[in-house]
């Protein structure tokens, strides 16, 4: 409006200079008559990549880039990952006992963590574009994979990895495929018609390796994916070096060696072979502990 004339605009990301679903943001700022734009980050998208800044400067707008860059990069990590690495940012969530178990030997797991931690998981889900599980978890747990208890919110996409799509067509995921987005990533030869008839979107990849799976999800527009299990999928993501953030909810009980581990075999023979995450934040949650870890860029899989 008129009050923008001569004002300073603060933006997280460089205003775009191309026509997408809306006209270029740089043009809108020029038309509004702002005198100065303070931008935390340049936009690495090849369609922008400095063009927005140059267009505003050519129009006589003073442009400053950099203030708040670290926080902006943290907040925009998913977008930056999809542009720079051609895959979404991956968060791995684990909820386990102090000795790394997710269930007793008999399979009992409800509930290891308390209600405060479980509510926090729903907030974590809401901060991601998609929730991802393996086919084994989908078959064993019949999960809904949704956000509950936080009001009427836009539900994340539910992603299930299953080479042959041998998933129950009468399960909760199938029954709600028309209401909450369900994406199925599968291998060659899987029968997709029954799932597509239910409203699911199917993606074929040569193999259920994290690299092609995440590339397909990134190409489909996802920027932030939260993996919630099971142990085999979690281990495969860690082995591939594609876990960017690791969030572990730990309860104050021990289940022993006979309990079910939160991870499958990682193939680690020497300490130097294990990815070493950096602690970002620890939060006490009414008797449980939430620890957030980040993988330094030099520890990730090159090119992934």
Predicted segments with their positions:
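Helical hairpin unit composed of two closely spaced alpha helices linked by a short loop
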Residues: 222-225, 229, 234, 239-240, ...
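Zn2+-dependent cytidine deaminase-like catalytic core
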Residues: 1-71, 157, 183, 188, ...
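Active-site ligand-binding patch in enzyme domains
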Residues: 2, 81-223, 232-235, 299, ...
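Conserved histidine-centered catalytic loops in small-molecule metabolism enzymes
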Residues: 189, 265-304
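Residue-level signal for inorganic ion chemistry
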Residues: 16, 56, 100, 134, ...
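Flexible, gly/pro- and Lys/Arg-enriched active-site loops
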Residues: 239-277
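Residues at the N-termini of beta-strands
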Residues: 36-37, 130, 224, 244-245
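Short, acidic/turn-prone active-site loops that include or flank metal/cofactor-
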Residues: 41-45, 68, 163-165, 187-189, ...
């Amino acid at each position: 409006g008129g009050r923008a004339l001569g004002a300073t605009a603060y933006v997280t990301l460089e205003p775009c200079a191309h026509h997408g679903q809306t006209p270029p943001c740089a043009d809108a700022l020029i038309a509004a008559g702002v005198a100065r734009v303070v931008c935390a980050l340049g936009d690495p998208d090849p369609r922008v990549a400095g063009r927005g800044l140059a267009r505003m400067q050519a129009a006589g707008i003073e442009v400053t880039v950099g203030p708040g860059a670290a926080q902006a990069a943290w907040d925009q990590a998913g977008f930056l990952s999809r542009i720079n690495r051609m895959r979404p940012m991956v968060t791995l969530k684990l909820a386990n006992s102090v000795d790394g178990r997710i269930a007793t030997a008999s399979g009992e797991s409800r509930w290891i963590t308390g209600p405060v931690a479980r509510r926090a998981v729903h907030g974590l889900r809401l901060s991601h574009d998609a929730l991802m599980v393996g086919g084994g978890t989908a078959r064993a747990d019949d999960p809904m994979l949704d956000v509950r208890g936080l009001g009427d919110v836009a539900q994340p996409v539910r992603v299930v990895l299953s080479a042959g799509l041998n998933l129950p067509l009468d399960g909760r995921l199938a029954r709600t495929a028309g209401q909450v987005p369900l994406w199925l990533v599968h291998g060659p030869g899987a029968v997709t018609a029954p799932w597509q008839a239910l409203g699911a979107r199917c993606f074929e990849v040569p193999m259920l390796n994290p690299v092609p799976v995440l590339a397909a999800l990134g190409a489909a527009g996802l920027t932030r994916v939260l993996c919630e299990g099971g142990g085999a999928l979690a281990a495969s993501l860690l082995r591939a070096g594609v876990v960017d953030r690791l969030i572990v909810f730990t309860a104050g009980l021990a289940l022993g060696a006979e309990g079910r581990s939160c991870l499958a075999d990682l193939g680690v023979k020497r300490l130097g072979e294990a990815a070493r995450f950096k602690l970002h934040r620890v939060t006490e949650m009414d008797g449980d502990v939430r620890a957030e870890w980040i993988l330094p860029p030099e520890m990730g899989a090159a090119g992934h």
